[in-house]
């Protein structure tokens, strides 16, 4: 790394009498911050109206609703089995990237969409592979792949006319931003998203400045 090399030459100048530090005019490369892309609530509402009532559409609606309702990762969705979701109690169990499982609530609209899919479309899709345990399957009754999931989302993003590419991460970002904008605390959001380091969750605070000001205006006696 440049910093280490620069430190070495600084040492050589001070201790060994090196005439010049060859790194002194070299600028450290700027590390670009990864842009966080997310949808507005109105865009989410539009998105959820796009899937039709075909078996594919019913499945796709369940996928979209569940990704947005829970903020889970693409890998967590495609690895999910039917036993991981409890529609009656309204939660799912997600192991994710960490060993420790986390429990995530599922909202009413997502529960209804997943229940409709499980009671109708999924049974048809797995007719040639009835032992399949993965929740989301393709036309062949096999688990939806990562590539397949991205293709599904891209299709609906283009239908909606979004300026950004619709990906699982965009829906995960949308979940995080909307939760914070509506009053969720960072620590709780960290638990829901499965972040080991809270700094990974805090990046979303940049999109909640208006909410923070509203809280201040309501709470501070001299605001």
Task: Annotate the PLM regions.
Residues 1-223:
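Conserved catalytic core of the tyrosine transesterase superfamily
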